[in-house]
């Protein structure tokens, strides 16, 4: 494989990286995110990036210790306790109750991706794990997927994040915080069983190693169950060890590994809406003799943190990723379905994908006091490199395979011995990104100001060779872009804090449209105003905001291309709306989380005039969520938790042209019951049981890309979890 095209400024990049790496020779550093004890209490007025080594939280929005309630931008936190209560199996499921997020865009049977949109803009599988991007093959299927067993919490940051993270869409981003080493010894063993023959075992162990300055965390799980779709399975094996070495009072090294093997991940295919209306969620348009999705992901990383003194510190966060994927599947074109008879013409294909990637982020932060003004300064340099390849093949099959009827599906028609390769293509893919960023987080009394900027250099290439040479070629991008953000928040002293921000975003674009015209980089901007409220006891919170986002030169699939591979540049898309998110304790033993989102999204300018005034797909105008827990604290049922939620998603456009109808709204109810078995007997101290029923009333719903490509939502599932901690 050819190496990635280097930057012309690569020598400068190396010099900058060397400058930031020099302190590592003199002393080791500390992981901040990966060393926060789970029971650490956070100071709500803390501005220092680092005060006590390993015990301060850095939020995604600012890469500093600024608390979410002090951040002049929308932030949603989903902690481990909520993840466990809801029994989630993916980040997709974890985001079901997050305001402004539309998740599971390809339904429940397609579980191999965490695909969702924030404030109307798709994230394109760009998730972050402990502050570093999870690399992915753009336009292909290879995306690492972090299992909730290894997650401490999930942060959803609303609005543009390019000022600190570079190439990101304007709607927002998700950062997954890993479970980290702890000094206090604890071990938890879990078993689960449930619908579709679910069997799962998990382990979570942490503690100090003897009397040494080493502490560890070991997370592992094995899970297997049938897919929602007939004839498919889901299977996963995960191990994620990590180690903290407290070298000195001011220096800590964290080393972490994440290995995940997915021998089977369900099926990756769609169906016409007419089939959805007639069939059950278990129906499949695929073939059991050609249904494979295997993925292997290895990530090895480290964090080095060093405090020079009480005010200045340096953090380096790095990760190497080696990932591969192989799938056998079928697909159909828009023109391949006859609604009157149910005849569906399918194509047979495989993809074989792999990549290696390195990501590194260097952060120098310091607190400078000038009179009554405190400046928390942050300067950073990050770099990422990906080198990958993918191959795609199509086959002609036996005659019986082409007699498939979607209304009466027979999923056993394909004869592998009669396959004949008819087309193949291979892609050599690579990209490099170098970013330099700065930020000044200012406090003056009750006023918090935030200002920052970032300059990115991005290059990518995609070299294609195929059995049809007329389609061969090389797609490249070469973009330099400056992004920035300003924001302000004022604490009125009664728990109420109004805020406002303006931020810009940047996304690279490679290749050409269907007419051969080069695609421009995508940029965006957001204006947001709102307020945050927190009661004096920190029990009740409320965030309300109005946002207006404009994305320029937005890229979408060309609706006139039946293969969905050609792209068009829309010109300008706006998204504006209102988000409300609150938490309240109605009693000491009764908590409620609720949110509402109003979203108005529209294509304002487009090269295809028929798209002007349309609403993109996966955009409900109204959505709302509510989750509650009630704890019984006395009597025979003491230790019982009764929890549940309701989530509503409004109707959405079925296709990009807004001519094929609407995807109906839906309301889904979930139930969660927990019990601390230690209340029944002292001998059972540490044992807990949790019963989760998702989609309690078995509501049937679906999502669509267009009328010939739809996916069922999650049907009712029941899961029983038993955990024993000691």
Task: Give residue ranges: language-model regions.
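Extracytoplasmic beta-strand/coil segments of soluble accessory domains associated
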Residues: 55, 59-68, 72, 92, ...
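Short acidic/polar hinge/loop motifs at secondary-structure boundaries
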Residues: 115, 132-158, 177-178
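Outer-membrane beta-barrel translocator/receptor signature
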Residues: 135-136, 150-152, 163-241, 247-251, ...
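Acidic/polar loop-and-plug regions of large Gram-negative outer-membrane beta-barrel proteins
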Residues: 223-227, 239-307, 320-355, 398-429, ...
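Structural signature of Gram-negative outer-membrane beta-barrels, strongest in the C-terminal barrel
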Residues: 244-248, 355, 374-376, 382-386, ...
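Membrane-embedded beta-barrel scaffold of Gram-negative outer-membrane proteins
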Residues: 305-309, 313-319, 323-329, 521-604, ...
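Gram-negative outer-membrane beta-barrel transporters
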Residues: 446, 569-656, 700, 723-725
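C-terminal beta-signal and adjacent terminal beta-strands/loops
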Residues: 637, 647-655, 675-726
């Amino acid at each position: 494989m050819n190496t990635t095209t280097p930057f012309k400024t690569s020598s400068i990049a190396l010099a900058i990286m060397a400058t930031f790496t020099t302190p590592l020779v003199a002393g080791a550093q500390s992981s901040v995110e990966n060393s926060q004890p789970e029971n650490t209490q956070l100071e709500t007025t803390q501005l220092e990036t680092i005060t006590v080594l390993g015990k301060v939280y850095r939020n995604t929005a600012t890469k500093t210790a600024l608390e979410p309630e002090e951040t002049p931008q929308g932030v949603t936190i989903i902690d481990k306790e909520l993840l466990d209560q809801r029994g989630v199996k993916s980040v997709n499921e974890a985001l079901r109750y997050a305001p402004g997020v539309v998740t599971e865009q390809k339904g429940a049977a397609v579980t191999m991706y965490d695909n969702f949109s924030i404030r109307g803009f798709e994230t394109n599988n760009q998730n972050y794990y402990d502050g570093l991007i999870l690399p992915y093959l753009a336009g292909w299927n290879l995306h690492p997927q972090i299992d909730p067993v290894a997650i401490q919490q999930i942060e959803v940051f609303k609005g543009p994040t390019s000022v600190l993270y570079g190439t990101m869409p304007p709607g927002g981003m998700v950062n997954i915080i890993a479970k980290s080493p702890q000094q206090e010894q604890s071990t938890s063993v879990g078993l689960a069983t449930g619908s579709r023959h679910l069997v799962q075992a998990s382990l979570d162990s942490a503690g100090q190693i003897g009397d040494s300055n080493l502490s560890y965390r070991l997370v592992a799980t094995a899970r297997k169950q049938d897919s929602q779709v007939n004839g498919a399975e889901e299977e996963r094996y995960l191990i994620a060890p990590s180690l903290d070495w407290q070298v000195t009072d001011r220096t800590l090294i964290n080393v972490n590994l994440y290995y995940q093997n997915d021998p089977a991940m369900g099926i990756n295919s769609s169906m016409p809406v007419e089939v959805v209306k007639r069939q059950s969620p278990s129906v499949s348009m695929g073939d059991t003799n050609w249904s494979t999705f295997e993925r292997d992901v290895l990530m090895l990383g480290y964090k080095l943190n060093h405090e020079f003194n009480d005010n200045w510190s340096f953090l380096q966060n790095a990760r190497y990723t080696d990932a591969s994927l192989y799938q056998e599947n079928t697909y159909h074109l828009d023109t391949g379905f006859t609604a009157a008879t149910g005849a569906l013409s399918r194509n047979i294909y495989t993809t074989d994908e792999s990549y290696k990637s390195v990501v590194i982020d260097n952060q120098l932060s310091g607190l400078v006091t000038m009179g009554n003004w405190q400046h928390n300064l942050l300067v950073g340099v990050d770099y990422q490199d990906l080198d990958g390849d993918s191959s795609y093949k199509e086959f002609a099959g036996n005659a019986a395979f082409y007699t498939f009827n979607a209304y009466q599906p027979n999923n056993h028609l394909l004869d592998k011995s009669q396959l004949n390769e008819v087309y193949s293509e291979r892609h050599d893919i690579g990209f490099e990104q170098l970013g330099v960023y700065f930020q000044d987080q200012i406090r003056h009394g009750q006023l918090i100001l935030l200002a920052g900027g970032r300059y990115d250099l991005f290059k990518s290439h995609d070299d294609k060779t195929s059995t049809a040479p007329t389609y061969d070629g090389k797609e490249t991008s070469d973009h330099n872009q400056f992004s920035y953000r300003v924001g302000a928040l004022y604490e009125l002293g009664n728990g109420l804090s109004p805020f406002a921000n303006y931020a810009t975003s940047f996304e690279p674009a490679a290749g050409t449209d269907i007419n051969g015209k080069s695609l421009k980089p995508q940029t965006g901007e957001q204006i947001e105003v709102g307020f945050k409220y927190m009661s004096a006891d920190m029990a009740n919170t409320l965030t309300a905001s109005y946002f207006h986002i404009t994305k320029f030169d937005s890229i979408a699939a060309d609706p006139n291309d039946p293969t969905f591979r050609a792209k068009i540049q829309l010109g300008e898309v706006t998204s504006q709306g209102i988000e409300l998110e609150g938490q309240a304790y109605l009693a000491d033993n009764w908590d409620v989380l609720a949110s509402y989102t109003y979203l108005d999204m529209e294509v304002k300018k487009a090269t295809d005039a028929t798209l002007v005034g349309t609403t993109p797909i996966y955009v409900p105008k109204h959505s709302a969520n509510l989750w509650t827990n009630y704890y019984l604290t006395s009597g025979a049922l003491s230790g019982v938790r009764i929890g549940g939620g309701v989530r509503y998603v409004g109707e959405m456009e079925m296709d990009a042209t807004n001519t094929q109808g609407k995807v109906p709204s839906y309301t889904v109810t979930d139930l969660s019951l927990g019990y601390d078995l230690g209340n029944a007997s002292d001998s059972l101290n540490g044992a807990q049981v949790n019963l989760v029923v998702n989609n309690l009333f078995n509501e049937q719903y679906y999502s669509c890309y267009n009328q010939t490509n739809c996916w069922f939502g999650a049907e009712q599932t029941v899961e029983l979890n038993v955990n024993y901690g000691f």
